[in-house]
Amino acid sequence: PVQYFLGKDNTSPVKVEVDAPQQHPDAVGTWRSITYTYEDGCQIVLWGGDYGDPNTPYISGPNGNVYKNFVCDIPDWEKKLSDYPEPEPQVTDFIECVKTRQPFALNERNGFRSATIVNTGAVALRLNRTLHFDPVKLEFINDEAANRLLDQPMRAPWNI
């Protein structure tokens, strides 16, 4: 949903920053924060467990912030929101989508980009460093170790 709200279903963050203790090589554990930054400066900040200031914005962008319960510090945000057209209705009945060949609201495109957010964060946590990501090439920039974690070899006898 965050990608949709931000109008970013067709892209991914260009930078992932982590603040976390060193992770076990085979599993990701706890973190203090993960910050995803998009090309336009918009950020998504995830706080882990009991860390973080409860007053930190959920979404922070160049024009303001959105906090818990959709509290905003964006000037005249309610008027700005009312100026936007209603979004196109989305079909949420999967069976109906199969029958009519309409795209499902939660489709492969936005599902892929949502999974990419999770995966890039997991890679940054495992390596415990800031990573830069190319959302078009779908690879980390100048970081072979990070790219190897995006496409890990499967255990035998499995393959694709």
Question: Language-model segments: what does each one mean?
Answer:
Residues 1-41:
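Rossmann-like dinucleotide-binding domain that binds NAD(P)(H)
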Residues 1-10, 31-33, 52-160:
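C-terminal helical cap and adjacent loop that interface with cofactors, partners, or active-site loops
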Residues 22-26, 49-50, 83-86:
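Short Gly/Pro-enriched turn/cap motifs at secondary-structure boundaries
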Residues 39-43, 63-64:
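Glycine-centered tight beta-turn/hairpin loop motif at sheet-sheet or coil-to-beta transitions
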